[in-house]
Amino acid sequence: MRKIFIILICLLIASPAFAGKAKKSPLYKLQKQLGNGEMISIPSYSTTSFIGIHKGWYKESPITVEALLTLPPGDGPFPVLMITHSSGGPLEFAADWLEFMRDQQKPLLDMGIGTFYLDNFSARGVKDTYRDQSTVTLFSAYIDSFMALEFLANHPKVNKKKIGITGYSRGGNNSLMIQEKKIRDALVDKSLYFAAAQPRSPECYAAAMFENPTPIPETKVWLVHGGADDYTLPGPCVEYGKKVKANGGDIKIDVREGWYHTFTGNYAVEKSPALIFHRCPPVYSKDNGQWDDEAVNYIVKHGPFESREDFELAQKEDPRAAWKGMFKAMKKAKCIDKGVHEGGDHGKEFMPEYLKFWKDNLL
């Protein structure tokens, strides 16, 4: 792996205030590499977890994120694919070790599909989160995706019924959770939806997904996971997919035997000293945004919090302390392990079926 990731649980309750001064987006470099595209500013918000969306706390933390939009020649309206990054940040769009991110653009444009590279980090003063996942939360990225969807839906050259989204790892979570009504309905008009999503290798065990998912039926999801992935385990995603399907969602879970995390990276499988929490309790969100009892009771038992109420108050008023307390609890309970595998150089092998998915669902 070209980076060291820290598993997603650390970012679930992070404070939007942790972000520093906005950085110049690597999308400007990507724009030069690709030789096309228009830089776009998207008004958005930051939050801690779903409870911040559910209770409207996110409105107190506005922010403007950037994206790179490229449309095929002509008047349109065109379908558009939103491409999101992992914990490595938007620099990976231009990285030598992840050519897949750029190689998809030309064939997509040739098919008549526009591209929209979304930067969740730079506006929040963050380069990447693999060194400290507490700096940008997953749920902030979900907000960005829906704000970007709203922008694209109002663009005169975009077909608002043919917008897709994709990404891997953290970007895989971003691409999976846009199928959730509870998030969509709290943020944008209920008539808006992504036509299709292609998440890869999301974290489904400790990412505060919903105990009771309420999927948007119009969104078709094709989730691809490596069967050998020891970083973000495929099993919890298979089980989550069953819940989504049982509740009316259009989802296919595709587990590839022998594939590891970051399987589209153009490098051989290698060991990474990443922290993993597979022996800690899973974390799920209830409909009201609260975490499940098992996870919270575990944190209260081993951490500095006296009760659920104490923990949730910290999430709102001092998220940094909440995160530190949670991590301290996991460390004290000795449920944290270290060491995963990444890579595999399957990008070129995967590309034809990946492009076919977009041809079938956005054209």
Language model segments and positions:
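Alpha/beta-hydrolase active-site loop
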Residues: 133-156, 177
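Alpha/beta-hydrolase fold nucleophile elbow
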Residues: 158-169
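Short glycine-enriched nucleophile-adjacent loop
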Residues: 153, 172-187
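N-terminal cap/lid segment of alpha/beta-hydrolase-fold proteins
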Residues: 21-76
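C-terminal catalytic histidine-bearing segment of alpha/beta-hydrolase fold enzymes
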Residues: 250-363
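Short substrate-entry loop that stabilizes the transition state in hydrolases
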Residues: 75-78, 83-127, 206-207, 230-234
